[in-house]
Amino acid sequence: MPIVNRIAAFDADMKKWRRNIHQNPELGLDCYQTASFIEATLREFGISEIHTGIAQSGLVAIIDGKENGDTIGLRADIDALPMTETTNLEYASNNSGLMHACGHDGHTTMLLGAARYLSETRNFSGRVALIFQPAEENEGGGRIMVEEGVLDRFNIKNVYAIHNTPDVTLGKFYTMPGAIMAGADKFHIDVVGVGGHGAYPHETKDPIIPAIGIVHSLQTIVSRSRDPNDKLVVSVTQIHAGSTDNVTPENTYINGTVRTFDKVVQDMVIKRMEEIVAGHAQSFGVDCKLRYEKGYPPTINNPENVEMAALAAKDVSGVSMVDDNAGQEMGAEDFSYLLEKRPGAYLFLGIGEAAGLHNTNYDFNDDASVYGASFFARLVEISQPLGR
């Protein structure tokens, strides 16, 4: 069957929900207004078991099927970004300096649409746990939810999530078994020398020269220390030194990001960074300090769950519109914390022509909501059928 007819029937309502959320973006863990809207909407559907205050402003709602069985977890992120919207849409952000530039308003709407349908029909066994999670963008709300025991508390067996993708055909799903998204780490290097007058460099220990050497040497981690079969990104994204033209600064700061798909490569990167930083410190007689921060782990899909998700996606969009062996993405996602604890799958959904994610002109395509909601609904019915 294609898009669920009942879900298509309330497409106009989903559009209203999405635009309401879009107009009222919130940041990080402080998504209380968004959570209140979600809770009120769920209660309109007749869903009474709603647990709030998870990861501060997150919530989990439970829908019981017609028969006993397992609990499937469906997750949507609800937070926005600290950006100023430039779309000039009539439903543009009302909150200065905040906007839904990554489509979390759409993700939330898709899960609400599935919730409405599932609460009406309940043609499945077991239970559905609807997970509305704050702080995907920065503070790791997924990690906090796991630490607070959300998976054990609701006895969730499998977990699934969707992310929208602009400029991919509307309704096209793609995913893959194994690591689909990279782990994301940060590094900070402080090069400390001796400052002084720019006219007397011999009386200083210039931190800029060794910093330049460090930046160049970091690039060799990818080109000379990495197995060519392993994907790896080491990007220097910030260099800060000095404040005027006739003073040699005391400090130079280097910041950047590392993207990896497995721990062996990650450990190699850390070891090589430590060696490079120590070597330049000794060569130039300066003090170099490396601070490496491990961030979101890789997002690793379970093959069996990918197969199940692909069945549901093909049921909604057709076989030709589903790629279940897509390539890896170098972006990162805190749904990875849930996948470390439970088998599941993360999928991408094309939303058609649109500005890129994290762009001030981005807007989620409302036409995609019926695809995502139908996917979640059919996933529940296919994976937890009645009479199993």
Residue ranges and their predicted role:
Residues M1-H100, T109, R116-F124:
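Acidic/His- and Gly-rich active-site-bordering loop/insert found
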